Amino acid sequence: MVGGELVLAALVILLALLLTLVLSHFLPLLLNPKAPKGSFGWPLLGETLRFLSPHASNTLGSFLEDHCSRYGRVFKSHLFCTPTIVSCDQELNHFILQNEERLFQCSYPRPIHGILGKSSMLVVLGEDHKRLRNLALALVTSTKLKPSYLGDIEKIALHIVGSWHGKSKDKGMVNVIAFCEEARKFAFSVIVKQVLGLSPEEPVTAMILEDFLAFMKGLISFPLYIPGTPYAKAVQARARISSTVKGIIEERRNAGSSNKGDFLDVLLSSNELSDEEKVSFVLDSLLGGYETTSLLISMVVYFLGQSAQDLELVKREHEGIRSKKEKDEFLSSEDYKKMEYTQHVINEALRCGNIVKFVHRKALKDVRYKEYLIPSGWKVLPVFSAVHLNPLLHGNAQQFQPCRWEGASQGTSKKFTPFGGGPRLCPGSELAKVEAAFFLHHLVLNYRWRIDGDDIPMAYPYVEFQRGLPIEIEPLCSES
C-alpha cells in the first residue's frame, strides 16, 4: 500500500513538473498575442536544433526559408530556451543595432560568459563596453596604416607563402595544402605580434596558440562543464592563456618601458583598466584578429577559386601595383588604397560567406516598430545573412559578383553588415581587410590554385570549411 502511494505521489510530481514546463513554454504566447506570427516548437527544446542545423553559409538554411515563407521576414520562435523575435528585415535589423542600450541590449547565452570571462568586450554592457570599445578603436586607428604594422603583415605573409615553395620545389609541381590552417597561422602570427609583440618562432607563441585552439573549440561546443569535454577544456585553456598574459604583463612592468609599440604597451600605460580587464582585452583582440581574419581570407580564396575572371582581374591589379615598386620593396598604405577591385572581392566574400550570421540582443522594454510588437525581455536575433542574401536587395544574391560593389559604398550600410553595426560594430574590421588584401597580394603573384574536391563554407551557425579547404597550388614561373 505504502509503495503504491509513493508511486502515485511520484506520478503527481512528474505530471506537475511536465505541466509547469508546458505552461512556462507556451505562456508567453498567451500573454503577448500581438507579437509577430511564428511558432514555439516543443517545450524545453523549442526550435533551437532546427535553427542551428548546418547549412551552406551562402544560403539561408531550411529553417529560415521555411519560417520566412510561412510567417514573413519577422517572426517569433523559441530559441536558446527563450521566447525570441527573429528579424530577417534590413530596416528592423538597423533599428535594433542603432538602439543598443536604449531599447535593446547585448544578451549572449550564459555559457559564453563562462569561457570569455565577465570582462570580455563581447559580453560587458553600458559604460564598461563603451570604455573598452573606445580603447579598441583608438588602438586600431593608430595601427591601421602604420608602416611597422604593414611591414609585419607582409613579412608574415611572405613567410607563409614562401613555405609552400619548399613543399613543391619543382616548377609546375602541384601541391595540396589545407588552406584554412595556413590562413589561421598567418592571422594568429599577425595578431600575436601586434598585441603582445611576440614573433611566430618564440616558444611562448606556440604555447598560446595551442591553448587558443582548445579555447576556440570550446567556444562553439555544448556548454557542459565535465572534465574532458571541449567546454571544460576551453575554460581551462582560457585560464592558462590568462596566466601567460599576466606573466608577460608582469615581465613588461619589471623591465620598464619596452618601446615595442604594440597593444600591450598602450594597455600598460592606461590607468582606466584593471589587470583583469587588460587580460580580457588581450583575449578579445586575439579572438577577433584570429578567427575573423583567417575566415575572411579563406572565403576570398574559396570564391576566387571558382571565378577565373575575378581572379584574373585581381591578379592584374596587384601586378600593376607591384610593377611600380622596387624588387624587395614593401607595400605601403598608398598601395592599399589602390587595391580597389580587391576591396570589391573582400566585400563580396563577406556578403556571400556570412562569417557573422546573427547577433544576440534582448528587448529592454516593449518595443513597437511599424506593425511589430517586440515584448520586453524577449531575445531578439537580427539575422545579417538573410539581408545579405535577399534578392530584392542584392541581384542574383547567391552569386559571387564583386562587380556589384563598383561605385557602391564600401562600408557598413543597412543592407551590408558583415561585422555587425551600431555601437557594437567590430572595431577591428578594417584591420581584417588590410591583412586579407596584403596576403592576397603575395598569393596571386606567386601561385595559381584550385579547390581540391568539394568543400563549401558551412554555417553551424559558426562558419567552417568541413575539410579545411584543401587547395591545389602551383607556383607561377615568374615570382614576385
From Swiss-Prot:
Question: InterPro entries recorded for this chain?
Answer: Cyt_P450, Cyt_P450_CS, Cyt_P450_E_grp-I, Cyt_P450_sf
Q: In which pathway does it act?
A: Plant hormone biosynthesis; brassinosteroid biosynthesis
What do mutants without this gene show?
The dwarf11 (d11) mutant shows the erection of leaves in mature stages, the shortening of the grain length and of the second internode in culm, and aberrant skotomorphogenesis. Treatment with exogenous brassinolide rescues the abnormal phenotype.
State the UniProt keywords alphabetically: Brassinosteroid biosynthesis, Heme, Iron, Lipid biosynthesis, Lipid metabolism, Membrane, Metal-binding, Monooxygenase, Oxidoreductase, Steroid biosynthesis, Transmembrane, Transmembrane helix
Q: How does it sit in the membrane?
A: Single-pass membrane protein
One biological process term from GO is: skotomorphogenesis
Residues reported in the UniProt entry to bind heme: C426
Q: Please explain the role this protein plays, according to its UniProt record.
A: Involved in brassinosteroid biosynthesis. May catalyze a C6-oxidation step and may be involved to supply 6-deoxotyphasterol and typhasterol. Involved in internode elongation and seed development. Catalyzes the conversion of campesterol (CR) to (22S)-22-hydroxycampesterol (22-OHCR, 22-hydroxyCR).
Question: What name has this protein been given in UniProt?
Answer: Cytochrome P450 724B1
Can you name the source organism?
Answer: Oryza sativa subsp. japonica
Quick one: which gene encodes this? Answer: CYP724B1
